[in-house]
Amino acid sequence: MLFPLRVIRRIHREGFRCIPEAIRFRIALHRQRPFLQTETALRQAEEDGYQAFIRRHEAPLSAPFTPTMRLSFLIPTYNTPPELLRALADSLLHQSCGAWEACFYDGASTRADTRELLQALTQEDNRFRVTFGAENRGIAGNTNAALTMATGEFVALCDHDDLLAPDAVRCILEAAQDGADFVYTDEDKVSADGTHFFEPHLKPDFAPDSLRSGNYICHITAASRALMNAVGGLRPGFDGSQDHDLALRLSENAAKITHIPRILYHWRMLDTSFSHQKAQTCADAAARAVADQLRRLHMDADVTVEELRVRIRWKTRQMRIVCLLWGEGDAPKLPMPCIRVRDLSAVNDLVRRTDCDAVLFLRAGLRPLDTDWVSELMQYAQRADVGCVGSALLDDRDCFRHAGYAVDVPGGAVSHQAGQWRYGRPYILTDRIVRNVTGVSSALLMIRRDVFLSVGGFSPYQSDLRGADLGLKCQQIGLLNVYTPYARMAMDTRLSLMPPCLTQGAPKGDLRRFRQTWGAHPPERYYSPLFRPDGSMFIDLDRQEGTP
C-alpha cells in the first residue's frame, strides 16, 4: 500500500506511534463535516468583520492622560527593508501619547538604504536614537545593546518590521504608573503589505502554567528598565525562544504583572519559510528555558518536547486518593478506593470523614481516553500552589463539553470551546496545552482534601456551577486551577445528549446564588473580555469599546 508523502514525513518525524491517531482523525473528520462547516462559517465571519472591528478598537482613548514616565522601545535591526522600517517609525510617530523613545541598535547592516533611513530618522525626530554596531550580535545581543541606550523608566521589545497601535504607549504607561513592573498586551497579525489584519491573539491574565506550556505573552512585552536590567535582558543560547525565556524570568521577579486586554501590536507576516527543523529548534530552546525556571524555583519535574510542544511531568509523591463516584452510569476501573454516591449534595461531610490526601470527584458514565490520567491529575493536585485540577470532557462526536470554565458571562459560567470539535480550531491548542482556568467541572475534579475543606467544600448548587464556584473560592485564597489535556474523558451516549455546556440550563436559584456570591462580574482572569460570551473563543465583533 502506498502512503501519501505527508504521511511518510510524519512517520519519519514522530515514529509509527502517530498512525493510530492519524486513523482516528480521518474517521472523526468524516463524521464531523457539519461541525467543520459551522466552524468555517464562524471563522469566515470573524475574518470578514475583523477589519471593521480593529478600526473601532484602535480609536484613541478620549480620557485625559498625563504621562510621568517615558517608554523606551528596544529595536534591533539588521538589513531591514526600508519600507518596513519606515512603517514602524510612522506607527511610533502616530502614537496618541508622545512619551516614548525608539532605541535602534543596528547589527552592522550591509544594506546602505537601511543605514541611510536609520540616520535620517535621527534628523526627523530626536526621539529616534540609533547606534551602529561594528558586528551583528544576533537578536539577543543586539536587543541588549539597545537596552544600554534606553533612558526611559519603562522599556518594551519591538521587532523592526512590525506595527504599533496608536494607544500602545499610552496604555503601557498607564499600567506602569499604576504600579506594574511587567506589562503585556494582546496582538494580531498583519499582512506583508500592512493592509490586512487577522488572527487576533486574545490572551489571559498572567497564567504561570499556560506560560510554561508556551509563550502566550509574546508581543508587546514591556517592563521597568530596573527589572529588565536586574534579570539581564535577553539571554544568548535560546534562539527562537529568547522572548519566552525572558517572559519566564520577568514573571519570577516582577512585583506586579499587568495584562492589557487590547490589541496594541501588529505582527507582520512575511513570506519567510519556517521549516520543521526551525520549529524543533524553537521548541527545544523553550523546553530548556522552562527547565531552567523550574530549577531556579526548586520545582522537581522532567521537561520534554512532544509534538513541538513543551510537556512537563511533575515528580509525584505518594498520595492517598479517594474517588467519589457520583451519578448514574458505568464506572471505569479505578486504582484507588471508591465511594459511590447518588449526587454531591452531602459530599462535604463525607470528605470530612474520609482519611485521604486528595479527593477525585468523578461522574459515572465517563471513560478515560488517557492511560495515565490519574497520575496526570495527581501531579498537579499535589502542588502547594494548585487548587482544582480537571481535563477535557468529550462527547461521542469528539466535541468539547468541558475544557475549563470562564465565569464573567451571562449564564454564570461557560466552558471554554463548549460544543466545538476537538480537531477543529482549538484556541491555543486546547487539546495539547496545560492551562490555568478559573474553574473546572465537578464531573472530573481532583483537589487536595485540606484545600477542599479550607474553602468550605462545594456550595449547595444543583448544577455544575458548583465546579466554577469551587474554583473561584480556590482562586480567592491565592491558588491556581489547572486544566490538563492529558487526562481526557469520553462521555457515554446518555451524557452526550446533555447541552453543549454542563452549566447550560442551570436552575434560576443557582444563578441567583452565584451572582449573590460573586457579583455581576466575577473575577475572570483567563477568558478575554473581547471573546464572545458563549465560550467559543471567537472574538466578539459586535462588542463596543467600554462595554463590560
Name the predicted role of every residue range.
Residues 10-67, 280-319, 397, 409-436, ...:
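C-terminal, non-catalytic tails of nucleotide-sugar-dependent glycosyltransferases
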Residues 90-99, 329-338:
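Short, acidic, metal-binding catalytic loop of nucleotide-sugar glycosyltransferases
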Residues 106-117, 135, 159, 328-330, ...:
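A conserved acidic beta->alpha catalytic loop
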Residues 133-150, 343-354:
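Glycine-rich, basic loop-to-helix element that forms the pyrophosphate-binding segment
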Residues 140, 148, 190, 197-226, ...:
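A recurrent flexible, glycine/aromatic-enriched loop bordering the glycosyltransferase active site
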Residues 155, 359:
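Short aromatic/hydrophobic "clamp" motif used to bind/position activated sugar donors
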Residues 167-197, 270, 366-411:
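Conserved donor NDP-sugar-binding/catalytic core segment of glycosyltransferases
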Residues 227, 237-263, 290, 374-377, ...:
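A short, conserved alpha-helix in the catalytic core of glycosyltransferases
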